[in-house]
Amino acid sequence: MKPRMLPLLVVVVFLAIPSWAAERQRIQLLVPADKLAEVRALTSPLPNSPETAAQGKAIYDGKGACFRCHGKDGNGNGPLAARLNPSPRNFKDHGFWSQRTEGEVFWLIKNGSPGTGIVGYGDQLTDGEIWAIIQYLRSFTGEHGPP
């Protein structure tokens, strides 16, 4: 490496750290620590199928109105996204599913997450509807059901 490149490299790394830290913050645990083991063990009672994902899509686009924040394509750019801080989750991000269990996502949809735009939908959606939405969310990365 040329000596003149070192200052440039330092500047690039320095500027990248806040972006990396912001993304790490978005992946932080949102389920209370005393419930985490129980929540991570939750699994969907629904069949892992394209039909279940289609049911989830209908709820995502309709009754659940998830698209308003997360976008029609699940990339976090729905019509209300610009008003939210932090930004809505991008479900096309493969890294998200490697760091969250379906049980955690179920709990967050049902109970909400303070400090984010997601309110609890447990009084509006049945458990089955929430599980169907989760299967649809997985389809954004080409997956169905748990890994």
Task: Walk through the language-model features, giving the residues of each.
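C-terminal capping alpha-helices of c-type cytochrome domains
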Residues: W107-P114, Y121-P147
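Detector for the c-type heme attachment site
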Residues: C69-G76, K110-N111, R138
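Electrostatic cytochrome c docking/interface patches
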Residues: L29-D61, P147
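Bacterial N-terminal signal peptides that target proteins for export
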Residues: M1-P7
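Bacterial N-terminal signal peptides
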Residues: P7-A16
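Sec/Tat signal peptide C-region and signal peptidase I cleavage site
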Residues: I17-A21
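Sequence/structural segment immediately N-terminal to covalent heme-attachment motifs in c-type
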Residues: E51-K72, A81
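Gly/Gly-Pro-rich "capping" loops immediately C-terminal to redox-active cysteine motifs
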Residues: K57, K72-E102, F106
